[in-house]
Structures are given as structure tokens and as C-alpha cells.
């Protein structure tokens, strides 16, 4: 049986990172946690009907800052989920942390509730740059807050960093990475800064560092991570042995997952091979009134191959040919022309067992994916 993930979206607080493009309405009044969790559970009850007799293998509580919720709220949520759908005894259960609400006390209690992986959104250790990106400013030194947490004691912790920030130098970016490595987490997410053009803060935050500097940051950062014992297994994810994020791996392998909460997305494979995409209402008010689903649709054959490769090509591993049919229920014959074109343009190499990106394919990933669009 394929793995099944559960993504829980908690899209608060209303003050977020300025570069995010989420379209949630801003609420001046504090939103009732108890009411939102009630609707999360009702949403899960409906979605659980799509996956009869299946067990949850990974849980990811995200949405930028779910740790703004009270401890009692998270405890209640996890307890009630078990009454709706079975959870594997060995499930990986992750929660995201906003740095401003980070505390060892919270991590300690989360562990008691069954959470065994923690993802801390640092973005940068440079306090001025952090405050220029985040609508939630912090007065205390970021590194000091992290050092108060015994990372080695809690083991399964991810530190989330961004490079190529506005006006960031090569030295500043590498210092961020060296600082994160010195804290000895078993997982580091390290991705390039990006902001949508339609974001209200685009003019202020789009003055990124020079492309040549970004390339140097990437090359030197990759060497630094490798030298420090971190293996790259996805475009922006690096881990020590046995500490890959199983939830994200399932996602990038084109596995199934339920998505509950405002603006959450899910993907479910039916017994007949049809694959359903679920999209929840991004209007928080409507969601809180019980209108959970915005749209459910079956992914067409044409789009299935594109979505499969969009996900799988993010992983730093060969794509086994048998997996294409396993996850899409489509014969490899259906994409023979696209594969042939990708090989001819030196984006992919093909063996009897797998396809693998060439260095050119990695460098021109968007061009490779365009082959599956036409």
C-alpha cells in the first residue's frame, strides 16, 4: 500500500512574511482556535471517505506559524484526528515553528503529544534582514533564541533558511549557512529567495542580490553542506543519514496526501486509478462557515505526466520507469515521444530501469518540463 500523508494548514497569524503571496483576508479580531479546529476535524471527516481502509503515515502541521496556536489546541487536534482516521505507530509528525514563538517548553510538550519532527522557519540569522522580511518582528537575537533550544537533544529538527535576500552579500549568505550548520541540526532546508510580481511588497523586496553572487552562494553553499555531512536529496533539502523529511519525500514522489484547512491542497488515488486533486476554500470566512471544499477534480492524462515529472524531478535521484505507471496508472508508451525529445535534447538519459536528468537537464529544468506541456 502506498504511503498516505496528512497536511494540516493553520494560516495564522495575520501578520506574515512580506514576500508570501497568500490571499487570506486579514482579520482584526482574534480568530477562535477552538472553532477553527472543529472545522479542521469536520473537513478531515469528509476527506477520510476518499481513503477508506488507509492509514496516515506522515502528518505535517504547517501554514507558516501553527505554533501561534495554544498547546492545548494542538494537543486536542492530534487526539481527535486518531478518532477519525488510523495513524501509523511509526508516523512522522511535523510541526512548523515561527522563530518568534520558539521555546524549548513548547517542543517538549509537542513531543509528549506525539510530534517527533520540528521545522523552524529562521530564514536568516541577520536580525535586520529578518525584520525587513517578516511582519512579525523579533527584538531578541535570533541565534540566541535558537541556542536556547538543545537541538541535539531533540534530534529531528529542520532549520529553514533562504539565500539571495535583497542586498545580501556572498559572505552574509554563507555566514547564515555556517551558523545553521554549527547548531548541528539533522536537516537543513536552503532555498533561493523569491517574490511574486503581484505581491504588494514586490518593489521593496525585489532588489535581490546580483545573479552572479546568487550562483556563487549556491556553489559554495553546496560544497559547505556536503563537507559538513549533509546529503542533498531534493532541490532545496539537505539531511544527515536517515533524517530526510518523509512527508515531503512522499509529496515529491507523487504519493497521496490529504490536505485539510483553509487553502489546503490534497491528492488522492482512487481504486480505479483515477487521481483526484482536492482544493480547499481559501476564503477563511467561508471555511469557518463549513464550506470547506473549493474544488475537487480528476487530473487528466495529459496533465498527469507533467505533474508526475514536476514532482519527481525535484528529487536528487533517478526516476524508476516502473514508478511512472505505479503512481499515474498510465502506460510509459503514452509519453514515449516526450521522453525521446528530452533524450535528444540531452536533458535526460535512459536505461532499462530508470530515467535520470543530465547536468543540462538540471540547469534547464523549466525547459525540460515544457516538453511535457506540449
UniProtKB/Swiss-Prot annotation:
Compartments reported by the entry: Cytoplasm
The reply to whether Nucleotide-binding figures as a keyword in the UniProt entry is no
Keywords (alphabetical) are: Cytoplasm
Instruction: Just give the chief location class.
Output: cytoplasm
For molecular function, the Gene Ontology terms on record are:
4 iron, 4 sulfur cluster binding; coproporphyrinogen oxidase activity
| GO CC, one annotated term | cytoplasm
Query: Which intervals hold domain Radical SAM core?
Result: 1-231
Q: Which domain of life is it from?
A: Bacteria
Give the GO biological process terms.
porphyrin-containing compound biosynthetic process
Q: Which family does it belong to?
A: Belongs to the anaerobic coproporphyrinogen-III oxidase family. HemW subfamily.
User: What PANTHER family does this protein's entry cite?
Assistant: COPROPORPHYRINIGEN III OXIDASE, RADICAL S-ADENOSYL METHIONINE DOMAIN-CONTAINING PROTEIN 1, MITOCHONDRIAL
Function, please?
Might be a heme chaperone; in E.coli heme binds independently of binding to [4Fe-4S] or S-adenosyl-L-methionine.
Name of the protein in its database record:
Putative heme chaperone HemW-like protein
What organism does the UniProt record list as the source?
Buchnera aphidicola subsp. Baizongia pistaciae (strain Bp)
Amino acid at each position: 500500500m502506498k504511503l498516505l500523508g496528512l497536511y494540516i494548514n493553520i494560516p495564522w497569524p495575520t501578520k506574515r512574511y512580506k514576500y508570501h503571496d497568500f490571499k487570506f483576508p486579514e482579520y482584526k479580531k482574534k480568530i477562535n482556535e477552538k472553532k477553527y479546529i472543529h472545522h479542521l476535524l469536520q473537513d478531515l471527516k469528509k476527506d477520510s471517505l476518499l481513503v477508506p481502509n488507509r492509514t496516515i503515515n506522515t502528518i505535517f502541521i504547517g501554514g507558516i506559524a501553527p505554533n501561534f496556536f495554544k498547546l492545548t489546541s494542538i494537543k486536542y487536534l492530534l487526539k481527535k484526528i486518531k478518532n477519525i482516521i488510523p495513524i501509523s505507530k511509526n508516523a512522522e509528525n511535523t510541526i512548523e515553528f515561527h522563530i518568534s514563538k520558539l521555546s524549548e517548553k513548547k517542543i517538549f510538550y509537542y513531543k509528549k503529544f506525539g510530534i517527533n519532527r520540528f521545522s523552524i522557519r529562521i530564514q536568516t540569522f541577520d536580525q535586520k534582514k529578518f525584520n525587513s522580511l517578516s511582519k512579525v518582528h523579533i527584538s531578541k537575537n535570533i541565534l540566541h533564541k535558537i541556542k536556547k533550544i538543545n537541538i541535539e537533544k531533540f534530534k529531528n529538527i529542520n532549520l529553514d533558511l533562504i539565500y539571495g535576500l535583497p542586498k545580501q552579500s556572498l559572505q552574509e549568505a554563507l555566514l547564515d549557512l555556517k551558523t545553521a550548520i554549527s547548531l548541528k541540526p539533522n536537516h537543513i532546508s536552503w532555498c533561493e529567495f523569491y517574490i511574486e510580481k503581484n505581491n504588494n511588497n514586490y518593489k521593496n523586496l525585489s532588489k535581490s542580490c546580483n545573479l552572479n553572487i546568487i550562483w556563487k552562494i549556491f556553489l559554495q553553499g553546496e560544497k559547505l553542506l556536503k563537507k559538513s555531512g549533509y546529503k542533498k536529496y531534493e532541490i532545496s533539502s539537505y539531511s544527515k543519514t536517515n533524517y530526510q523529511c518523509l512527508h515531503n519525500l512522499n509529496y515529491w514522489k507523487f504519493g497521496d496526501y490529504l490536505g485539510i484547512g483553509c487553502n489546503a491542497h490534497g491528492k488522492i488515488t482512487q481504486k480505479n486509478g483515477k487521481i483526484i486533486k482536492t482544493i480547499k476554500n481559501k476564503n477563511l470566512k467561508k471555511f469557518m462557515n463549513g464550506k470547506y471544499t473549493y474544488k475537487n477534480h480528476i487530473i487528466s492524462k495529459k496533465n498527469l505526466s507533467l505533474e508526475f515529472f514536476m514532482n519527481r524531478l525535484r528529487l536528487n535521484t533517478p526516476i524508476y520507469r516502473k514508478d511512472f505507471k505505479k503512481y499515474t496508472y498510465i502506460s510509459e508508451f503514452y509519453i514515449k515521444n516526450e521522453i525521446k525529445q528530452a533524450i535528444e535534447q540531452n536533458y535526460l538519459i535512459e536505461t532499462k530501469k530508470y530515467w535520470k536528468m543530465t547536468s543540462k537537464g538540471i540547469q534547464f529544468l523549466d525547459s525540460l518540463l515544457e516538453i511535457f506541456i506540449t
